[in-house]
Amino acid sequence: MSNKGQLLQDPFLNALRKEHVPVSIYLVNGIKLQGNIESFDQYVVLLRNTVTQMVYKHAISTVVPARPVNFHPDAEATTS
């Protein structure tokens, strides 16, 4: 994945992680996972509920926060 794609992903996921916002993650096969984002990198998201699951980003369709989240992508992303 290019850096440009991560200019949006990283601040969004980081805001969800820092604010401990519960999320629903829908996979491409339709399965719904729920929990809190513990950590993430370029390829995976660690989702914590009763256990911690490693979810590969290529399997994720949608991330839905339980409440609105304020996040600010890098200023460079809006000027490029």
UniProtKB/Swiss-Prot annotation:
Pfam families: Hfq (PF17209)
GO biological process, one term: regulation of translation, ncRNA-mediated
SUPFAM superfamilies in UniProt: Sm-like ribonucleoproteins
InterPro entries: Hfq, LSM_dom_sf, Sm
Sm domain mapped to chain residues: 10-69
GO CC aspect terms: cytosol
Record-level Gene Ontology MF annotations: RNA binding
CDD domains, alphabetized: Hfq
Keywords of this entry: RNA-binding, Stress response
Family per record: Belongs to the Hfq family.
Function: RNA chaperone that binds small regulatory RNA (sRNAs) and mRNAs to facilitate mRNA translational regulation in response to envelope stress, environmental stress and changes in metabolite concentrations. Also binds with high specificity to tRNAs.
Quaternary structure and partners: Homohexamer.
Annotated protein name in UniProt: RNA-binding protein Hfq
Organism of derivation: Burkholderia ambifaria (strain MC40-6)
Source taxonomy: Bacteria, Pseudomonadati, Pseudomonadota, Betaproteobacteria, Burkholderiales
Gene: hfq
